[in-house]
């Protein structure tokens, strides 16, 4: 597998409960390196633009409210097959369906407050990374 980068967000439900370190440990234990990371408080407008692909979905407004309700940690993860590996570590969107040992199985509170976001493809990873980071901030 090729070395690749993916984008991750540790969401407000997890940052409120001080789970950033525990979640980062899961990434690192799986062989992913954190090559960029910052804690930010997204505005509702930033969240809306980031999740614009979901604008027509019934949960869009609630998602934007949630993502701007408290700080998040945005990060770039690097490793062999990083996109697929991150999605495996995160677990299913619904924590009730997430495999034991995954981030969502251990930490998520609900489908809406599921602790993490991860890119689903190389194209979206590149777009999502560029939304939050300049090339100078990627220090892997």
UniProtKB/Swiss-Prot annotation:
EC number(s) recorded for this UniProt protein: 2.7.4.6
Cofactor: Mg(2+)
Signal peptide residue numbers: none
Keyword set, alphabetical order: ATP-binding, Cytoplasm, Kinase, Magnesium, Metal-binding, Nucleotide metabolism, Nucleotide-binding, Phosphoprotein, Transferase
GO biological process entries: CTP biosynthetic process; GTP biosynthetic process; UTP biosynthetic process
Record-listed ATP binding positions: 11, 59, 87, 93, 104, 114
Function in brief: Major role in the synthesis of nucleoside triphosphates other than ATP. The ATP gamma phosphate is transferred to the NDP beta phosphate via a ping-pong mechanism, using a phosphorylated active-site intermediate.
Self-association state and partner proteins as the record states: Homotetramer.
Protein name in UniProt: Nucleoside diphosphate kinase
Gene name, Swiss-Prot/TrEMBL: ndk
